[in-house]
Design a protein with these regions (language model features):
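Conserved ABC ATPase signature
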Residues: 115-122
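Helix-to-loop junction immediately C-terminal to a conserved catalytic motif
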Residues: 51
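Catalytic Walker B motif of ABC-type/P-loop ATPase nucleotide-binding domains
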Residues: 140-144
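Hydrophobic anchor residue at the start of the ABC signature
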Residues: 129, 168
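Conserved ABC ATPase "signature" region
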Residues: 97-111
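A short, flexible loop at the N-terminus of ABC-type nucleotide-binding domains that lies
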Residues: 1-26, 55
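Q-loop/switch helix immediately C-terminal to the Walker
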Residues: 73, 78-93, 98
Length: 189
């Protein structure tokens, strides 16, 4: 899995104020970055910049490999079954065959036919993570991935992240909650 992610002297402006400036780091295959800081300092904005959804005021972001984003929103059609909602996104990446394994990996295979609107908060969060798994992207951008998850689900998340890194993937995680990312590069805002 060939992947890299680099921030070079990146500055972020939101709401007329600079959240961070001159930010630089490089993540290579198998590495993780842990973005931490209090609410409102730009953790989510950093993830959005990495995803290409927000342009930096200055500097640039470079990288190799497709990126998969887990944001606050699950980005799943509430009226479709869980499998169909994930299938839509997986189809964009020509990876519909990966949906079943992704649902199994997050412990939701038994409710694949349930409409997304009926899922609990934790189930929706795991479903959103299944979307990342099914994408096959080597670079994962995870914004508050543990929100709404119980202890067992956090353990599953940590195990999947570790396996992805062991396979040469990159993970950039923004969180204010404790999450196990051994050897992660700390990016404090």
């Amino acid at each position: 899995m060939s992947s890299s992610l680099a921030f070079e002297n990146v500055t972020c402006l939101r709401g007329g104020r600079i959240l961070f400036e001159g930010l630089g780091f490089v993540l290579a295959a198998g590495e993780a970055g842990l973005v931490q800081g209090p609410n409102g300092v730009g953790k989510s904005s950093l993830i959005r910049i990495a995803a290409g959804l927000l342009a930096p005021l200055g500097g640039r972001v470079r990288g190799d490999g497709a990126r998969a984003l887990l944001s606050e929103s699950a980005a799943l059609d509430a009226e479709r079954s869980l499998a169909a909602a994930l299938g839509f996104w997986a189809g964009l990446d020509q990876r519909t065959a990966a949906v079943g394994a992704a649902l199994d990996a997050v412990g939701l295979a038994d409710i694949a036919d349930v409409p997304v609107r009926l899922l609990s908060t934790g189930q929706r969060r795991r479903a959103a993570f299944a979307r990342v798994l099914a994408s096959g992207a080597p670079v994962w951008l995870l914004d508050e991935p543990a929100n709404g998850l119980d202890t067992a689900s956090i353990g599953m998340l940590e195990a999947r992240i570790a396996a992805h890194r062991a396979d040469g993937g990159i993970v950039l995680v923004a969180t204010h909650q404790p999450i196990g990312l051994p050897g992660a590069r700390e990016i404090r805002l």
